[in-house]
């Protein structure tokens, strides 16, 4: 399906090793642990690596000036499951797949249920669990491991990002947080102001 517009959400993949084959967010080891696939015997499946990470901040603008609200996040989060993970958005460089998706608190990464999220207007995270294929691209999995080593020049250099396509949008004016911004949905007013958007050179 073709979309008129695309944007990318990005979050640092700050991880630590919880077993020889599993990685999870360093800042919140216990909080994101339930997202790491636990129905896989990593000792038997030595070619797999389990990973958990925050994928995007909701209700806050990304570096492109784009943002996603709570209702949109809820609508699309489950659609991450079973999607492939790749390198640099190259669909020919698949290195794993998403196996779980959820939400976590911004800052602490404490997991939240969908009902709790529905009432939130402040920033929170979409959090994902994935399985990576070690043998498909050993250089990539080694890069992940090196990103955990504080003495490596690759330390904390890995980030997770995902591209979103959409055909329409509204404007949020006045704040970097959606909850504090004025929402403009009138097509004529959007047309007048869209030149100020980064995607239009503003």
Map each language-model feature to its residues.
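Signature of dsDNA virion morphogenesis modules
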Residues: 1-202
């Amino acid at each position: 399906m073709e979309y008129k517009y695309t944007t990318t959400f990005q979050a640092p993949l700050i991880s630590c090793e919880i077993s020889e084959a599993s990685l999870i967010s360093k800042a919140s080891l216990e909080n994101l642990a339930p997202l790491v696939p636990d129905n896989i015997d990593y000792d038997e499946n030595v070619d797999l690596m389990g990973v958990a990470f925050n994928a995007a901040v909701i209700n806050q603008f990304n570096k492109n000036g784009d943002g996603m609200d709570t209702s949109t996040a809820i609508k699309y989060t489950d659609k991450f499951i079973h999607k492939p993970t790749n390198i640099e958005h190259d669909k020919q460089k698949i290195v794993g797949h998403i196996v779980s998706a959820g939400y976590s608190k911004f800052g602490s990464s404490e997991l939240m249920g969908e009902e709790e999220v529905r009432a939130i207007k402040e920033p929170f995270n979409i959090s994902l669990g994935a399985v990576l294929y070690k043998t498909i691209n050993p250089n990539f999995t080694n890069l992940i491991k090196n990103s955990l080593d504080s003495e490596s020049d690759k330390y904390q250099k890995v980030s997770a990002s995902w591209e979103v396509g959409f055909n329409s949008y509204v404007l949020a004016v006045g704040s970097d947080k959606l909850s504090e911004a004025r929402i403009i949905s009138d097509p004529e007013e959007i047309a007048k102001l869209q030149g100020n958007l980064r995607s239009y050179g503003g």
